[in-house]
Amino acid sequence: RLLYVALCLALIFLHLLPLETLPRGWAGPDVMLALTFAWLLRRPDYVPPLLIAAVFLLADLLFQRPPGLWAAIVLLGNQALRAREPGLRDLTFAVEWLSVATTLFVMMLGYRVILALMMVDQAPLGLSLMQVIATLLVYPLVAIVSKAVFGVRKIAPGDIDALGSRT
């Protein structure tokens, strides 16, 4: 859990660094969200809901987004994936990726609808779609790095979770 928080804080820090002085014409991936999804679908006990909410609320505050809105939507998306995780455990990576893609698109649409209802200025739809697609393209890489570097693999029957109980 501490590693997840450290990685998220490092990603937030890298996002806040002023590496470019001109605004970009494209939207990069949300690596923190891809990391959260990858770890959630492999070891849900490593990313409890309150930890996800706290990390994304901090990101909302630091990135000057509407406080708590994206954090709440991420939490809802994570809970939807958490409910499907036992069924996805034995299926292929393509099914997992499709499930993540569906969740990401629904989250993005929900975020945009709520911002529109509240009459808040938002990024063009093209940039939002570009970010979702970029996040989906980086997701396999995040999943591979999570397994190869950090040892976060899918739960097998009989594994012991972080709380000491068998799965």
Question: Which residue ranges define each predicted feature?
Answer:
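Terminal, non-globular segments
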Residues: 1-167
